Amino acid sequence: MPGMVLFGRRWSLASDDLVFPGSFELFLRVLWWIASLTLYLMHRRKLDCPGGVLLSTYLIVLLVLLAVIIGIVLAIVCVSMRGTICNPGPRKSMSKLLYIRLALFLPEMVWASLGAAWVAKGIQCDRTVVIGIIATVIVSWIVIAATMVTIVFVFDPLGGKMAPYPPCIPEHLDSNSSNHLLTGLRTAAKSVWETRVQCCCCCIGQDDNTRVAFSSTADLFSTYFSDTDLVPSDIAAGFTLLHQQQDKISHSREPSEVVTHTPGQPQETELDAEVENCHHYMPFSPVCSPWPVCVLNSSRVELCRTGNNFCRGRDIEYDAVEGDEHHCHFASILKTTGLQYRDFIHVSFHDKVYELPFIVVLDHRKESVVVAVRGTMSLQDVLTDLSAESENLELDIELQDCVAHKGIAQAARYIYRRLVNDGILSQAFSVAPEYRLVVVGHSLGAGAAALLAIMLRGAYPQVRAYAFSPPRGLLSKSLFEYSKDFVVSLILGMDVIPRLSVANMEDLKRRILRVIANCNKPKYKILLHGCWYSVFGGSPDNFPTELDEGNQGALTQPLLGEQTLLTRCSPGYCSGDSPLDSPKYPTLYPPGRIIHLEEEGGSGRFGCCSAAQYRARWAHETEFSKILIGPKMLIDHMPDVMIRALDRVVADRTACVSCPGQGGSNVP
């Protein structure tokens, strides 16, 4: 629901968000009241000492004050449980209760201060009583400090400008005035988001690229949230409902409704070859990671010992290692890949915004020069990811609409300049002129690898790219079709990154609004049931995802409840409009042909990948046009999880080579 309006400004807190914090405070206050009452009843006869009257008065007033606070907090919790997310009517008294509760902090602070002052006088009373009162004073200040921290977290810097959110532009304003007002609001929102991003990334250097990335990221966030009035708990409830709704639809689907496709023998043979290639090249993708990550991903304990030996004493004879002063990262690469010094042409750990680490190595087994690009491992990489505007690419190919993700395109362009202008590829092919060029990467590195292959194809027509878990919002339609000839993308399970794009995020926002508007359960029940369902499973029919009268089709229609969660920013606003529907954020696609590793059966809610069974199949990009919500949406993106899944798929397919019937079922 819309954020509450208190003291004339909007806060990032809804009136139904106080069930859990209120219950926790209620539990704490009741225990505190019981302990204080017990202390007073058991030791009141010992309060006839000098200063004991002050302590007795302190305890009596504290008990009365706690009783009043307990009553108010209980009322807040009960009122917060009423209604639904889109029906705040039963909670209209919440603001008055909060004003009373906040007013009670004043006598509580005064009494805690007096208690501290009286105890500090060195009153000569029973030691147990004094310690008990000191404890109550400490608890009082802890509760007050926690409340102040909570207020800071729920404070909305834009609340004074945008509270309450207007349902529409005031009618007395002409178009120029309304445009001026909206421009001011957007500028303020972007400024707030830019400050937030800078605070989160305060430890990285400030150069021109970083400042541009800050601006792009702030523009994306401010634009995305500009037409909604949701608080964080609403989004969490929406995720919970979408997860259960997905499972409910999946469970209710008849077997005949599941579309399967059995490819012809040439396609299946090609799939086997490409899966084997992915299995071979995937370990190259994360090798540019910092050495602690490689140690964590390695099952060999000696890697730590070997890495430390390299860090302490060995001088690397190569001058091709860049940005690794103590050679720890390079030592981990040697152990994880099993390659020799002579196989490395160039290793760069240089990491800045729009500038990614990469390696160039000779792969003698596949007779290829491998360029591996690192994925997201730093705040600089996150800023590169979030620079989601599109920009035109200047390519020597006859294609129209050559547009790509701005941040990833600039990162690919940086690596291209290093490879070509610095002669790194020329050096590699002077050593092995008969080898072919292969570009690989994972996550952010996958997107950069695909774009790098597109840029290099004019000079290296035989280039191949393997993009592991690439972001969806990468290429325009024409570049997507063009890349199918030489780029293969591998996606595991419910991985969220290959489904992540500006368009998909906008679709996710609309789905959240609709499922919230359709749900007739209070938010606290949604969150409780959702946590239980995510951890322990169960039937989604038992949870609050059902629509009134079971009408699933209603989710496609705008609802009154949905409209209450939208901020209409112009007189011409309608529910289908979006501030992200602009040339700055066109629809973008993933790179190349897609191999999807699907989990067969289940391995538990958070099951280990080694216990799961997977099948590989060719997939269409439209299958990844919607973000799926589930426990594995992040786990399936991890490189080590993908490597183990590939190990299992390759082992199963190899074992079934002599079993055509079983092998065919592995490729729907």
UniProtKB/Swiss-Prot annotation:
Residue numbers of Phosphoserine PTMs: S570, S578, S582
GO BP field: arachidonate metabolic process; cannabinoid biosynthetic process; diacylglycerol catabolic process; icosanoid metabolic process; monoacylglycerol biosynthetic process; neuroblast proliferation; neurogenesis; positive regulation of triglyceride catabolic process
Pfam name, any one: Lipase_3
Family matches, as PANTHER family: DIACYLGLYCEROL LIPASE HOMOLOG-RELATED (PTHR45792), DIACYLGLYCEROL LIPASE-BETA (PTHR45792:SF2)
Tissue: Expressed in corticostriatal and hippocampal slices. Highly expressed in striatal neurons (at protein level).
Keywords for this protein: Calcium, Cell membrane, Hydrolase, Lipid degradation, Lipid metabolism, Membrane, Metal-binding, Phosphoprotein, Transmembrane, Transmembrane helix
Cofactor names: Ca(2+)
InterPro entries to which the protein is assigned, alphabetical: AB_hydrolase_fold (IPR029058), DAG_Lipase-Related (IPR052214), Fungal_lipase-type (IPR002921)
GO CC, alphabetical: plasma membrane
Catalyzed reaction equations: a 1,2-diacyl-sn-glycerol + H2O = a 2-acylglycerol + a fatty acid + H(+); 1-octadecanoyl-2-(5Z,8Z,11Z,14Z-eicosatetraenoyl)-sn-glycerol + H2O = 2-(5Z,8Z,11Z,14Z-eicosatetraenoyl)-glycerol + octadecanoate + H(+); 1,2-di-(9Z-octadecenoyl)-sn-glycerol + H2O = 2-(9Z-octadecenoyl)-glycerol + (9Z)-octadecenoate + H(+); 1-(9Z-octadecenoyl)-2-(5Z,8Z,11Z,14Z-eicosatetraenoyl)-sn-glycerol + H2O = 2-(5Z,8Z,11Z,14Z-eicosatetraenoyl)-glycerol + (9Z)-octadecenoate + H(+)
Name of the protein described by the UniProt record: Diacylglycerol lipase-beta
Molecular functions per Gene Ontology: lipase activity; metal ion binding; monoacylglycerol lipase activity; triacylglycerol lipase activity
